[in-house]
């Protein structure tokens, strides 16, 4: 029998490259394009 409780993860991709907002919210080392991208995976 098929397991009806099986669920797939929710995947959200954030791509903030090219944003015109001034970079005031972060401190630390020099940012690269990798600092403006993120993948979020969650089990709902």
UniProtKB/Swiss-Prot annotation:
Lineage: superkingdom: Eukaryota
Renumbered residue ranges of the record's region 15,16-dihydrobiliverdin chromophore: 24-26
Membrane protein topology class: Peripheral membrane protein
Main location class: plastid
Post-translational modification: Contains one covalently linked 15,16-dihydrobiliverdin chromophore.
Pfam families documented for this protein: Phycoerythr_ab
Binding site for 15,16-dihydrobiliverdin: 19, 21, 40
Compartments, as annotated in UniProt: Plastid, Chloroplast thylakoid membrane
Keyword Plastid: yes
Sites of 5-hydroxylysine modification: 4
One GO CC annotation: phycobilisome
Residue ranges, annotated region (Disordered): 1-44
A biological process term (GO) from this entry: photosynthesis
Transport as UniProt keyword: yes
Cystine pairings recorded for this chain: none
Keywords associated with the record: Bile pigment, Chloroplast, Chromophore, Electron transport, Hydroxylation, Membrane, Photosynthesis, Plastid, Thylakoid, Transport
Record text on subunit structure and interactions: Heterotetramer of 2 different alpha chains and 2 identical beta chains. The subunit composition could comprise of any combination of 2 out of 4 different alpha units with an invariant beta unit.
Stated role: Light-harvesting photosynthetic tetrapyrrole chromophore-protein from the phycobiliprotein complex.
Similarity remark: Belongs to the phycoerythrin family.
Miscellaneous remark of the record: The light-harvesting system in Cryptophytes contains phycobiliprotein complexes. Unusually they are composed of either phycoerythrin (CPE) or phycocyanin (CPC) but never allophycocyanin (APC), with only one type of biliprotein being present in any one species. Unlike cyanobacteria or red algae these proteins are not arranged into higher-order phycobilisome complexes, and they are found in the thylakoid lumen.
Name this polypeptide is given: Phycoerythrin alpha-1 chain
Organism: Rhodomonas sp. (strain CS 24)
Gene name for this UniProt entry: cpeA1
């Amino acid at each position: 029998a098929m397991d009806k409780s099986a669920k797939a993860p929710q995947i959200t991709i954030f791509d903030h490259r090219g944003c015109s907002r001034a970079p005031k919210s972060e401190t630390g080392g020099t940012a690269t394009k990798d600092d403006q991208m993120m993948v979020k995976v969650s089990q709902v």
